[in-house]
Each structure stands twice: as C-alpha cells, then as structure tokens.
UniProtKB/Swiss-Prot annotation:
CC terms in the record's Gene Ontology section: cytosol; Golgi membrane; membrane; plasma membrane; protein-containing complex; Ric1-Rgp1 guanyl-nucleotide exchange factor complex; trans-Golgi network membrane
Gene name of this polypeptide: RGP1
Function: The RIC1-RGP1 complex acts as a guanine nucleotide exchange factor (GEF), which activates RAB6A by exchanging bound GDP for free GTP and may thereby required for efficient fusion of endosome-derived vesicles with the Golgi compartment. The RIC1-RGP1 complex participates in the recycling of mannose-6-phosphate receptors.
Lineage: Eukaryota, Metazoa, Chordata, Craniata, Vertebrata
Native source organism of the sequence: Homo sapiens (Human)
Protein name per UniProt: RAB6A-GEF complex partner protein 2
Family that this chain belongs to: Belongs to the RGP1 family.
C-alpha cells in the first residue's frame, strides 16, 4: 500500500497567469520495523492541469461533434488521461509533467516532489452556473507495474482578470526583489510581479469614488433619488447605496434591492423554447435588503459581495453580469398621509388602513464586479488544499 498526498502551498485559489505550486508526497505507511520484503514500488507519476466544461442540455444547444475528427481517446486504463470519467469535455489543459519514474519505498520511507505550472491565461474562470460549468482540477496520475492508473484530483479555483493577456514580463531591474538580500528565481519574479500588477489594476479600477445620482419615477411622478459612489467593485466588498424619498411626489410604501448575477447564453447557442428548452437567462440573488419606507425621508443599504462568487466574464457560449435589482411598491393615492393628528382631544385608537391601492415596478442598475486577491479569496474556498489517495 502506498499513500499519495498532494498539498497546494498557497491554497486552492489562483489568478490566471500565476504559477501553481504543489508538493506531492509519496509514503509507504508500513512501520519501519517491517521486513524489507514489504517495500512498495510505483512505475511512474505524472501531473497535469485541465479545465472541464459541462453544459445543460435543456439550456444550451451545442453544435454536434465533428465527425471528420475521430475520437482518439484510448480505452486502455494504462494511458494517462486527467479527465477520464469526468462529465463534459476538456477545453483546456497544460502539458503533462513527469514527477518520477521507477520509485521504490521501504517501510516508513517517504519522498516529496515539487510540481509547478503556470495557469493558462486564455481560459475562462471557475464557474458553476445553471447553464454551464467551468471546473479546474490538478490531476496526478500514478501507476504500478501491470496495473491501471490511479488518479488523484485536486480541485482548483481560477480567477481571471481581463487585460493581463497582453502584458509582457519586463526583462530588466524593474522586477528586482524589494530587498537586496533576497534572491528570487525567474519564475518567482514573474509570479510576484504578475500578482502585484493585478493588485495595482484592481485597486485603480475600484478605488475611484464619484457620486452617481439616479432619479426614480413611475408613470405618475417621481418616487425618489438613488445615490451610489461607484459602479466597479471587487469580490468581498460591500455595495453601499442611499435612497432619498423626501423629494418624491409619489408615496413609496416599500422597496427591496437585490444583488444579482445574470447568466445569459449567447444567441447562437440558445435552445429554442419549442424544442423543450428553458429560458436562456437565469438570475441568482447573492444578497437582499427590504424595507418598509412610508414617511421615510432618507435610508441606505449595504450588500456584501460574496468572496465565493464569480466575477463578471464573457465567453463564446455564456456571459455573466452583475446588477442591482430594485422593486418598489407605491401608493396610487396622491398625497397619502397615514399619521395620526398631533393633538388628540380624547383617547383614540389609531389603526392603519386595511387596504391600500398600490402599484409595483422594478429597475435594474448594472454594476461591474472584478476578482480580488487569490489569498483573500482562499478564505471562502470550499475545497481543501490537501488531497490524499491510497494505492
């Protein structure tokens, strides 16, 4: 029996273009007092990163596979295929790297191997939606002699920041370590430089604050004014807004605001409703605020953007956008006043009206959500940083 442990050195969340580092430890768990005949051997081990794509058949109409391209996937269980047994199709993969060959371990002995690979920058982000799913995994394949391959899969979460594809790593002193007493290899320099550049771009895009005001009205007049200080956010930030109802001519009885994502299938891949398809647009609510606001002059709300959510993106098949979805309940009666008189000549019981004629309407405000630091996003990652398998 051999135990294989894969541990990600920095957590399971990465930015596309960063270098993933994983330590693979192979151990013979028998006690050292066992006989030498209890030694274990592995023929080889290899590692590869791949992205698996899966689409809902009721929502997405994918083109049929090209019959001129034969299926070259072998049926043999002795061939290393990282996506073997996975749902969907592999749309992106890195070249496989061999970790070791002809490894023999005595009882109680263990050996560790380091795997490093740059995550492809041209791929989609990790996403589990109602129409499509993009799932990244690091797969480690191990094989005994004359035995099938055993696969160890480590789930990953990949964040994509648009605009880094065209950035070139400078080959000069601009990327030198901040301390002259520290030495970094070329890969470490590039990885830290890319993370620093991404942080600077995210800070520049999300730190600009300027008050934006929107007049809210229905067909009968002005309801109020909505104010928001910015429209670009990072994962983990709060969307803060204010609502001024004191200037409205139409009484607002209640309002709600929801932080939502809109997943939309591209027109060329939408399945027709008559062919058993479902709507090509789906919405997910991540946070919601509701308030009864009759006689309220000014109010505010704060909606947190979950660290575990996916920033907005667009591929050839699907797009994901963020928005604030407002719903207002207004009175049909002009000048609605439901306050008791200031002076009461005698004891009086005051009750609200049993029925109020109302109208409802909604409004959507698009916002932009960008990734955040992979280290910060790791706190919300559902997957562990260590995976184990026994052969």
């Amino acid at each position: 029996m051999i135990e294989v442990v894969a541990e990600l050195s920095r957590g399971p969340v990465f930015l596309a273009g960063e270098a993933l580092e994983c330590v693979v430890t192979v151990t013979n768990p028998l006690p050292p007092t066992a006989t030498s005949a209890s030694s274990e051997a592995l023929a080889w081990a290899s590692a590869q990163i791949h992205c698996q794509f899966h689409a809902s058949e009721s929502r997405v109409a994918l083109p049929p596979p090209d019959s001129s391209q034969p299926d070259v996937q072998p049926d043999s269980q002795t061939v290393f295929l990282p996506h073997r047994g996975e749902r969907g199709q592999c749309i992106l993969s890195t070249p496989p790297k061999i970790l070791f060959c002809d490894l023999r371990l005595d009882p109680g002995e263990s050996k560790s191997y380091s795997y490093s690979e740059v995550l492809p920058i041209e791929g989609p982000p990790s996403f589990r939606g109602q129409s499509v799913k993009y799932v990244y995994k690091l797969t480690i394949g191990c094989q005994r002699v004359n035995s099938p391959i055993t696969l160890l899969r480590v789930p990953l979460r990949v964040l994509v920041l648009t605009g880094l594809q065209d950035v070139r790593f400078p080959q000069d002193e601009a990327v030198a370590p901040s301390s002259p007493f520290l030495e970094e290899d070329e890969g470490g320099k590039k990885d830290s430089w890319l993370a620093e550049l991404a942080g600077e771009r995210l800070m520049a895009a999300t730190s600009c604050r300027s008050l934006h005001l929107y007049n809210i009205s229905d067909g009968r007049g002005k309801v109020g004014t909505f104010g928001i200080f910015k429209s670009v956010y990072r994962l983990g930030e709060d969307v803060v807004g204010t609502l001024n109802l004191g200037e409205g001519t139409v009484a607002c009885l209640q309002f709600s605001v929801s932080l939502q994502t809109e997943e939309r299938v591209q027109p060329e891949y939408q399945r027709r409703r008559g062919a058993g398809g479902v709507p090509s647009v789906s919405h997910v609510t991540h946070a919601r605020h509701q308030e009864s606001c009759l006689h309220t002059t000014r109010t505010s709300f704060s909606l947190p953007i979950p660290l575990s959510s996916t920033p907005g993106f667009c591929t050839a098949i699907v797009s994901l956008k963020w928005r604030l979805h407002f719903e207002f309940v207004t009175s049909r009666e002009p000048g609605l006043v439901l306050l008791p008189p200031v002076e009461q000549p005698e004891p009086t019981t005051w009750t609200g009206p049993e029925q109020v004629p109302v109208d409802t309407f909604s409004w959507d405000l698009p916002i932009k959500v960008l990734p955040t630091s992979p280290t910060l996003a790791s706190y919300a990652a559902p997957g562990p940083s260590t995976s184990t398998i026994t052969i």
